[in-house]
């Protein structure tokens, strides 16, 4: 279920029964391979786990790396000249990018998901900041600098933001 929360009210957006882009955060937090479970259900109709086996194990945050101009937010297309994803403890990258691949306008701008996990939110943010500093994507523009700005902003660090926060950040 997707919703927005503003001024004490919840606003329903949609309910999706398909796998969501954010599933990686759920996988990290609960240490469950959701895709594997979906395939298993499709194959034999049964989950390999039950509800009382599902326990929160950590904190996780996902950054979506988009091929876009960080100022105008218009799509960026071209050839990826250099691609070097970050790594290290608590870092996961889901991407099909590679040096030499072509990014066209015939797709969603999401080119990678950078997921951190850690014992708490602060550790996740620290790991994401380091990973974004290490991330190298040359040949197309990305929103990496915007994500670094967000992760360093005091409002974000204090978890004091709402649905119009990003607009205020850039005004």
Segments (PLM) and residue ranges:
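ATP-dependent carboxylate activation and anion-phosphoryl transfer catalytic cores
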Residues: 1-171
